[in-house]
Amino acid sequence: MSVETQKETLGFQTEVKQLLHLMIHSLYSNKEIFLRELISNASDAVDKLRFEALSRPELLEGGAELKIRVSFDKDAKTVTLEDNGIGMSREDVITHLGTIAKSGTADFMKNLSGDQKKDSHLIGQFGVGFYSAFIVADQVEVFSRRAGSPSSEGVHWSSKGEGEFEVANVDKAERGTRIVLHLKNGEEEFADGYRLRNIIKKYSDHIALPIELPKEQAPAAEGEEAPAQEWETVNRASALWTRPRTEVKDEEYQEFYKHVAHDYENPLSWSHNKVEGKLEYTSLLYVPARAPFDLYQREAPRGLKLYVQRVFVMDQAESFLPLYMRFVKGVVDSNDLSLNVSREILQKDPIIDSMKSALTKRVLDMLEKLAKNEPEQYKGFWKNFGQVLKEGPAEDFANKEKIAGLLRFASTSDDSGEQSVSLADYLARGKEGQDKIYYLTGESYAQVRNSPHLEVFRKKGIEVLLLTDRIDEWLMSYLSDFDGKNFVDVARGDLDLGNLDSEEDKKAQEEIAKDKEGLIERLKAALGESVSEVRVSHRLTDSPAILAIGEQDMGLQMRQILEASGQKVPDSKPIFEFNPAHPLIGKLDAEQSEERFGDLSHILFDQAALAAGDSLKDPAAYVRRLNKLLVELSV
C-alpha cells in the first residue's frame, strides 16, 4: 500500500453520530440493504462521470468500460465495492462522508416508523445511504480519487462508525472509489459469492451498467502461477426503459421505481412508452403511492431523470412536466436533444414544449385509467396528491376539462365528509332539468355541511359539492364549467335555481319581496354601512337570515387566506338576506321601537356572519346587544 500523507483525525458532525447510532441499532433485521445503497451511490458516481466527460473527455483517462465490481475475502472477512466513476477529492470525502445536510437527517429521523423494512428504504430518500455500511461492518475504509486529478491526490478515509474518522492522502492509480467493509463478527455470510449475487439480483438488477463479481476458478496446480482473476456480470446491465414493455416484469418496474424515486413502497401506477416519428424519445413515468415530505414546498427539487441517447444528463429536469405534476417520478430518454443540453436551454427549446405536452397527457391518461379501474387506489392517490392536482386548472388551461374530471369532492349526498365524488358522478345524479353544478366553499366540513345556504337545496333534494381545502376558492376561479354545465357558488349573488324552481315558486317569491319592501327599507337604515344590499332570501327554509357574497366580490375563504398572509384585501360588503317565513323576522317586522329594531337587526346580522364562518368586527357590541335582549325577555 502507498505511503499515507497529511493524515488527520476529524470528528463526525453531531447529526452523523445520531444517524450512525440509529442505523446500527434500528435496521439490523434488514442488513442486506447496505449493498443496494452502495451500488446505487456507485451508479450515481458513474452517471456523473459520463455527464462531466461530455465537455471534458479527458476525465475518462483513456477509456475502460464503466462498471461496478463487488468482491469478497472470506479469510479477511471483507466485502469490497469498487466503481470507476467520478471519484472524490479529499475535500469531497470530508464533506460527503463526515457531514450531512441537517434537514435531511431531521427528516429521516422524523420519518422513522419503527418498521425496519420501511425504515431501511428511507435511507436512500434522504441521501444517507453510505452509512448503512455500518450495519454489517465495524470498520469501513474508502479509497477514492477524483477523475482528472493526479494519482498522488488519492484519498483514504477510515472509520469505525463511532465518534470520528481518519483521512489521509494516498497514491491511487485508478480514478473512482473503492469501499472496503470489515465485517462484524457474525456477519461473515456476506463474504460469499452466492449471497452477494442474490442481493444484487434482488435489488440492483435494473442498474444500467455492469455489476461484476469474481468468477469461481479452479485453484492453480502446485508450482503454477495463479491465473488472472476473471469477472462476470450478474445484473442485466441494460437501461430498463430501453427494453420492450412485454419483456419487463412488474417486479422489475417496481424495483426500478424504488431506485429512481428513493422510495420504499411500490408505485401506484406507471406508464412506459416509446415515441417514434417527428420526435423520438422513451418515457417511463411513475405515480407514487405516498406523498414525499417536501410536496408542498413548491421550490423543492422535482422533475424527471433526463437521458440523451441513454447517456445520463441531469437529475430533476423539471421542464418536462408542469408544476402541478411535481409528484411524478421517472425517466425520459431523448434522441433529439443535444448531449450538452443545460437547464436554461431546456426552458427555451420547442422540442421540450412538444414533449411536455405529450408527457402531461400521458400522466393524465394514467390517472384516468387508475380512477376508472382501481377506484380504491385512486382514493389513496387523491388523499396524498389531490391538493396538488387542484393547482392544475390554473396552470394548464389546455387540459382543464381533463383535470376537472379527475378532481374529487365531498358533497351533501352523504355525511362522511370524504372527498370521493367526481363531477361525472355529480352530473349523473343531477335532478331532471338541472343545468348547473352547485358548490359551497368554507373553512371546515362541519361549517359548510351545516351552512344555512344549503337549506333550500336540502328541501328540493339538490346535491351540493362541499369544498373545504384552502386552495378551493382559488381553484373555482379557474373552473367556470364542466361538460357544458356552469359552476354556481350557492353563497354568491342572487340564487337562481333556473328550471328547478317552478313558475309558481318564482311568482310567489316576487310577491313576497314586494310585500316586504317596508321591512327591507327599515333593515337598510338599521344596518347602514355594514351591508351592500338587503333582500328577501330564496335560500332559507329554517334560518332567519344569511349573508351572501356579491357576484364580483372576493369570497370569505380567499379573504381570510390573504389577510392571514398580511396582504391587502379589497373592500366589499355582504348582502343581507332574510327569511320572511321565520318567526323572528315576523317579530322584527312587528317591532315598534326603532332602537330595539336596530339591536335585533344587528344581532341577526352578526349571527349570519358567524354561521358563514366569519369573525365579528365588534364582538363586544354583539354580546352587549344579546345580553340586553336576554334581560328584556327574562323580565
Swiss-Prot record:
InterPro entries: HATPase_C_sf (IPR036890), Heat_shock_protein_90_CS (IPR019805), HSP90_C (IPR037196), Hsp90_fam (IPR001404), Hsp90_N (IPR020575), Ribosomal_Su5_D2-typ_SF (IPR020568). SMART domains: HATPase_c. PROSITE patterns: HSP90 (PS00298). It holds the Pfam family HATPase_c_3. Keywords: ATP-binding, Chaperone, Cytoplasm, Nucleotide-binding, Stress response. Its main location: cytoplasm. GO terms for cellular component: cytoplasm. Residues 561-635 are annotated as: C. Residues 344-560 are annotated as: B. GO terms for molecular function: ATP binding; ATP hydrolysis activity; ATP-dependent protein folding chaperone; unfolded protein binding. SUPFAM superfamilies: ATPase domain of HSP90 chaperone/DNA topoisomerase II/histidine kinase, HSP90 C-terminal domain, Ribosomal protein S5 domain 2-like. Residues 1-343 are annotated as: A. CDD domains: HATPase_Hsp90-like (cd16927). It is found in: Cytoplasm. Molecular chaperone. Has ATPase activity. Belongs to the heat shock protein 90 family. NCBIfam families: PRK05218.1. HAMAP family: HSP90. Homodimer. This is Chaperone protein HtpG. It comes from Pseudomonas syringae pv. tomato (strain ATCC BAA-871 / DC3000). The lineage of its organism: Bacteria, Pseudomonadati, Pseudomonadota, Gammaproteobacteria, Pseudomonadales.
